[in-house]
Amino acid sequence: MKLTAEQEDIINSRGDIKINAVAGSGKTTTIIEYAKTRPATAKILYLAFNKSVKLEAIKKFTAKGLSNVTVETAHSLAYKNIVFRHQYKVRVQGYKTHEIAELLGLQGNGEKHHEYVIANHINKFIALFCNSDKLKVQDVNYLETISDAKAKTFVKTFYHFIETQTRNLLAKMDRGEIEITHDFYLKKFQLQNPVLPFDYILFDEGQDASPAMLDIFLKQAATKVIVGDTHQQIYSWRYAVNSLEKTGFKTFDLSHSFRFGANIANLATQILFWKEAITETKPITIKGLGTNNDTKTKAVIGRTNLGLLLKAIEYVTEKKNIKQIYFEGNFNSYTYADEGASLYDVLNLQNNKQSLIKDALIRSMSTIKDLEEYIEKTEDGQLSMMLEIVKKYGNDIYNIIKTIKQKHVENNDKEKADIVFSTVHRCKGMEYDAVHLVKDFITEDKVNRQVHELENDEKKISK
């Protein structure tokens, strides 16, 4: 295939570089061609963002006969170096709030569910520290991540205790007394300052790298190439930083997209310019080289599982012409919060049917009011969304979910669906002809409110 001038410049480059690649710009092709033009004796590491990308990359590098390229994820590298060496046992799904409370022997203080609120913050504190590049828990300011006023007041009051118990839980993992999390072994790997035996390291999807991942990458002596799209960061909720903006490497752009034509490219360019209203951003002009096709896939995309489910419920109950639908991933996962509570647990709490509640945290609550107070003190957005759905639809939820499952088609019949539902994380890299965004993304009002709160906090500090 004929390469663009931008691709040629990257392939012929020398030294550490960063590549800002727009959607559909032939990023993978460019990386493969870059690897092909390095010396055959060079040891090359390609760092994929997740396992599915890793498996796809292995196929592509193998097909090109590039036996000198090793494909890993940051976690698979850490797993081999930490888990095997220390014979740790890994907890696949992480710890739930009630499990942390039990492991640490947290006690109530008279306030409702005090120990669970504390445990919830410990869980998030650990995630923040493990994804950071900091050396000690004390170096991380967890309070900065809290925006809700009631949650912030709670954390301020109990900060020292939350921090101490965060350290205690990490120490239990370190000693092998309990199973370790994926975040933990990556953090331990970063703290050991590993030296990776490669001449070149190609770091893909760099815009979603955590500070811990970036720290490992930047400390290597190898020639470093970081690739990504500064406008496609979707893992900031996992404390990712836009690593392309954190590196001082020479910058190359891949601005020609083969995925869509000029109309979409021009619209995308205009939308990206809007970012200048909230942050400093380098303008980029996208050139659409793609051609239209006859596929007419319609998709609804949300930020959260439950926000998407709420929109799907609206479609099923209000739009009678929708006969077949498809959810990217397992549909059942859309009715659960990350920690395990299901929509039915919250519904059973509202109906005072505690004996039917499976999740330990929800089962510990007596009323919906208890759940509302817990949500206020923890900023648990997923439980808040569940509560909203239960209050809006009540016992109709049973028949609504049943109807959704009846309309849902299997993977091999996806193209027959009238509409596809997906979160932004599950549909990354996929293509749809028409997209409707659910209103669960951050709004201008919320951005302005957070800026106002930050300015007020800064004024208080300066006094």
Task: Please place each PLM-identified region on the residue numbering.
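P-loop NTPase Walker
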Residues: M1-Q87, T269
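Conserved helicase/translocase P-loop NTPase motor core
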Residues: K2, T153-L202, D208-K219, I400-V424
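Short, surface-exposed amphipathic charged segments that create phosphate/polyanion-binding patches used
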Residues: K18, I82-V92, N266-I271, D338-N348
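Conserved helicase motor core of SF1/SF2 NTP-dependent helicases
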Residues: I19-T29, F49-S52, L77, V195-L196, ...
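Short, well-ordered alpha-helices that flank and scaffold nucleotide-derived cofactor binding pockets
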Residues: E33-A40, K59-A63, K187-L191, D215-A222, ...
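Conserved P-loop NTPase-based nucleic-acid remodeling module centered on helicase motor cores
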Residues: K51-I126, K319-K320, I325-S333
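ATP-hydrolysis module of ASCE/P-loop NTPase motor domains
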Residues: Q87-L169, N352-K377
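Conserved helicase C-terminal RecA-like lobe
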Residues: Y344-K463
